[in-house]
Every structure is written in structure tokens, then in C-alpha cells.
């Protein structure tokens, strides 16, 4: 076994962060489904390093080490979720949500277990799951009135059974709410149009769901919603702080939003443009030769102000050289997008050891159990205007009270 790399560092983006602001740490990783980890695809990887039992232990150790609030994992098969990840992560305070790709529904129960999909884990002692939704791109496209009769939908979008998961959560302690999205787009480089259509469908659903979530009722009796515990005989958990009331949001763009995953798209793609700019015009090179209803007639857009968390270190020595590292391809295709009006980046997980990479032409290997690397960012939830106004009013009121009651003569 070759010597290990030096550990990846967390790169501080903002040093002066108010301790009163709530922090959220988000981790995203395509873990390479066991079914795809074959010697024919990864002939350069030692056989034992490709073995699922070995890779699983490396993956779980990495998740334990990073200790994020949210884990967005792609290429997780149903059996890996049920048998391996959920039980082990439950010991680390995580609860999970998983859906396999759509093909699982057409298979026998046994075969369906090996189908990969997306898994989202969250710290059960810190967050309550209010809602979860599965987004199946092919079935949504084929049922859209403006798309269902178009050949390009049948021939290009429909055969790809990629999915996304949308979770709506609330902090037990502060009542702050978040929308967390985990997505895995199609990989085929010849299907750039399909990737941006999938992204358009995703953001359309995020927009509609966020409108619904802005009207979501407050959580009653938070104390009654159980916190995941250990085994019988374990010491009781420490007493919980008094939970705060559910926060209220006036519109869909006010709720903090995080969109993570394997987008299989580089920075020069229409997918990146749509996420970062909020719009892709109908005459975009990756769309102009196809017919996808209103998406190719009017363009694709979403109302959120999103930024790639790693954009903060672009052009610096700490810039990520890739997130996917194979002999034929090395580039950034995985992202953590965040809503800039509600969240600020505090730090991100830096690149792998550069000297080590010179010795290692590709992943997976003994130290990196998947062909993708992990990405992680920590955020603070921005203070809200009404809260600030409330605090200012309370302060002014207190000052007036102390001023009028002090007996100090006024000029």
C-alpha cells in the first residue's frame, strides 16, 4: 500500500463570523456504487481496494471524520443504504432518506436492491424532517403538456432515469428552516441538453415546493418529536435546550436553499449557467437544436440567487483541480449551490494533496474509495431583517425605559 496523502485542509473563507449566527455544514459525495466498481472499468485499481467491504469502511470513516449536519450521497444502492450506511450512520446521530433510480420499480425485489440512487442523511438530534419529495425527471417530462408529444423527450430525456431528492427540514433549537436538494444528473457527455432539461425540471419543482414550504405550518410540541437515541443501557442523552418556535418565511426565496450533487457538468455548461445566472436562453448552443416545449421556446429560469460554494477559491492555489478523477477525465462536476440572500460560506474542504496526486494517476485507490472526491462547505444562516428590527426596537425601548426612570433632569 502506498503512503497516504496529507489530510485535506478546511479553507477559511470568512474569519470574522458572529458567534450568534447559526452554522450549517453540508457534505456531498458520489460514493461509486458497488455494481459499477468493476475491474474492467477500474483496471488500474487494486482488486482489494475495489472490494465493497473495504470501500464501505473507508466511506464510513470519512463520513464520521467530517461530521457534517447533512450528507448528500449519490450512487447509493438500496441494499447499501439499508444494510450498511443507515445502521452505521444511526450510531453517529444520522437519520436518512433514500430513493433508487426509477428502473427499480420495473425489477424484481432482489434485483431492485442493487439499483443506485440518492441518499440524504441529517443529524437527528439537530433537525426535524418536515417533508421529502422524489423528483423523477423522465416521468415528469413525459407528463408535461408542452413536452409529452415531442420526439426529443421520447428519444433523449425519457431513457434516462435519473432522480433528485428534496428535503425540507427545521432546526430543533432555532426553528430555522432549510430546503436541501440532492441530485445526480445523467453522465453521458453527448446529452448536455438532457442535463439542462433535468436541471430545469428540478429547479421548477424546487420553486413550487418552496412556495408551499413558505406556507408550511409551525411545528407544535417539538419536545414530543423524538431525538434518535442509542441502544438500551446507554447513558441518557444530555438535556436538550428549550426548542425555539418555527421561523416564518414570506416567500419561496426567503427559505435557505442548498442544492448538492453530481451534476456531471463543467463550469462552461448550460447547467452551470442556469444554476448560477438563474436563466438559460432558448438559443443556447446546448439547447438550440432540440424541442423541449416551453424550455426551448422561452428558455429555462428559476427565481433563486445561487452560487457555487467553491467559487470563493476559484483562481487561488487552493482551487479544486477536479471532483472526478479517472484516466480519461479529471474536472469539477460536483457542486454545493447555496442561496446567497440567506446563507454565507464560512469554509470549504480543500483539494487533495498535490504531491500525492503526482504519484496517483486516478481514483479509486487505497485512500480514495470512489472516483469522485468529497466536497463540503460550512455556512452561516444570515441574520434576518425582522429579527434585527425586533432587537433594535427592544434595545431602543430598554434605553428609553432606563432613561425615563433614571431621574436624570432633561435639558
PLM feature spans:
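Active-site-proximal segments of metal-dependent phosphoesterases and phosphodiesterases across multiple
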Residues: 185-204, 223-241
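Active-site metal-binding loops of divalent metal-dependent hydrolases
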Residues: 31, 76, 185, 262-263, ...
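Structured beta-strand-rich core segments of catalytic domains in phosphoester-bond hydrolases
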Residues: 2-23, 70-193, 299-303, 336, ...
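Proline-aspartate-enriched helix->loop->beta-strand connector
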Residues: 56, 61-76
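Acidic/histidine-rich helix-loop elements
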Residues: 31-53, 138-157
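Metal-dependent phosphoester-hydrolase catalytic domains
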Residues: 1-15, 126, 159, 168, ...
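Residue-level marker for buried hydrophobic side chains located in beta-strands
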Residues: 26-27, 259
Amino acid at each position: 500500500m502506498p503512503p497516504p496523502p496529507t489530510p485535506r485542509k478546511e479553507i477559511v473563507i470568512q474569519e470574522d463570523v458572529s458567534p450568534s449566527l447559526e452554522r450549517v455544514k453540508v457534505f456531498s459525495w458520489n460514493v461509486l456504487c458497488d455494481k459499477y466498481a468493476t475491474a474492467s472499468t477500474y483496471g488500474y485499481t487494486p482488486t482489494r481496494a475495489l472490494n465493497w467491504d473495504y470501500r464501505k469502511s473507508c466511506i464510513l470513516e470519512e463520513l464520521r471524520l467530517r461530521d457534517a449536519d447533512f450528507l448528500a450521497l449519490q450512487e447509493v444502492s438500496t441494499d447499501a443504504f439499508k444494510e450498511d450506511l443507515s445502521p452505521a450512520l444511526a450510531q453517529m446521530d444520522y437519520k436518512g432518506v433514500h430513493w433508487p433510480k426509477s428502473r427499480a420499480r420495473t425489477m424484481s425485489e432482489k434485483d431492485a436492491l442493487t439499483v443506485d440512487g440518492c441518499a440524504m442523511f441529517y443529524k437527528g438530534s439537530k433537525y426535524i424532517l418536515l417533508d421529502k419529495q422524489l423528483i423523477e425527471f423522465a416521468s415528469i417530462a413525459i407528463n408535461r403538456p408542452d413536452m409529452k408529444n415531442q420526439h426529443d423527450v421520447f428519444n433523449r430525456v425519457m431513457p434516462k432515469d435519473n432522480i433528485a431528492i428534496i428535503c425540507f427540514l427545521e432546526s430543533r433549537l432555532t426553528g430555522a428552516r432549510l430546503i436541501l436538494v440532492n441530485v445526480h444528473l445523467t453522465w453521458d457527455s453527448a446529452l448536455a441538453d438532457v442535463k439542462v432539461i433535468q436541471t430545469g425540471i428540478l429547479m421548477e419543482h424546487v420553486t413550487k415546493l418552496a412556495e408551499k414550504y413558505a406556507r408550511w405550518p409551525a411545528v407544535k410540541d417539538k419536545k414530543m418529536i423524538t431525538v434518535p437515541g442509542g441502544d438500551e443501557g446507554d447513558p441518557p442523552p444530555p438535556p436538550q435546550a428549550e426548542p425555539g418556535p418555527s421561523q416564518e418565511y414570506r416567500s419561496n426565496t426567503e427559505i435557505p436553499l442548498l442544492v448538492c450533487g453530481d451534476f456531471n457538468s463543467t463550469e462552461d455548461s448550460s447547467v452551470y449557467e442556469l444554476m448560477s445566472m438563474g436563466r438559460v436562453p432558448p438559443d443556447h448552443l446546448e439547447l438550440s437544436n432540440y424541442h423541449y416545449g416551453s424550455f426551448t421556446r422561452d428558455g429555462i429560469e428559476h427565481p433563486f440567487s445561487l452560487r457555487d460554494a467553491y467559487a470563493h477559491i476559484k483562481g487561488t492555489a487552493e482551487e479544486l483541480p477536479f471532483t472526478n478523477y479517472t484516466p480519461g477525465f479529471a474536472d469539477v462536476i460536483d457542486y454545493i449551490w447555496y442561496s446567497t440572500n440567506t446563507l454565507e460560506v464560512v469554509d470549504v474542504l480543500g483539494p487533495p494533496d498535490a504531491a500525492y496526486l503526482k504519484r496517483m494517476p486516478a481514483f479509486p485507490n487505497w485512500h480514495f474509495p470512489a472516483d469522485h472526491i468529497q466536497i463540503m462547505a460550512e455556512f452561516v444562516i444570515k441574520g434576518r431583517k425582522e429579527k434585527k428590527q425586533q432587537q433594535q426596537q427592544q434595545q431602543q425601548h430598554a434605553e428609553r425605559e432606563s432613561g425615563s426612570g433614571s431621574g436624570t433632569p432633561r435639558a
